[in-house]
Amino acid sequence: MGRSLKKGPFIADSLLKKIEKLNASGDKQVIKTWSRASTILPQMVGHTIAVHNGRQHVPVFVSEQMVGHKLGEFAPTRTFKGHAKSDKKARR
């Protein structure tokens, strides 16, 4: 179930302030954030945002196709190394 249209999209206040500040100055800097739940807004297009995946910050370049999605969708939290070669149960 999605978020109510009446409420609008969620975005961390600190992240929104940083984006607006960079848009006003015209700078292109990497913005570090831990807010994976923030929705990508049209103001963010063209910026690189480093999203925390639990271990490190993954740089995400925001494009127009990403608008409306969450930042956490583009920073995977799990790394699959593959099943063990001798483990026949897992490969079945």
Curated annotation (Swiss-Prot):
Keyword Phosphoprotein among UniProt keywords: no
Name of a matching Pfam family: Ribosomal_S19
Gene3D superfamilies from the UniProt entry: 30s Ribosomal Protein S19, Chain A (3.30.860.10)
GO cellular component, one term: cytoplasm
Disulfide bond entries: none
Keyword annotations from UniProtKB, A to Z: Ribonucleoprotein, Ribosomal protein, RNA-binding, rRNA-binding
Parts of the chain that traverse the membrane: none
GO molecular function terms listed in the Swiss-Prot or TrEMBL record: rRNA binding; structural constituent of ribosome
Role played: Protein S19 forms a complex with S13 that binds strongly to the 16S ribosomal RNA.
NCBIfam families in alphabetical order: rpsS_bact
Name of the molecule in the record: Small ribosomal subunit protein uS19
Species of provenance: Picosynechococcus sp. (strain ATCC 27264 / PCC 7002 / PR-6) (Agmenellum quadruplicatum)
Lineage, uppermost ranks: Bacteria, Bacillati, Cyanobacteriota, Cyanophyceae, Oscillatoriophycideae
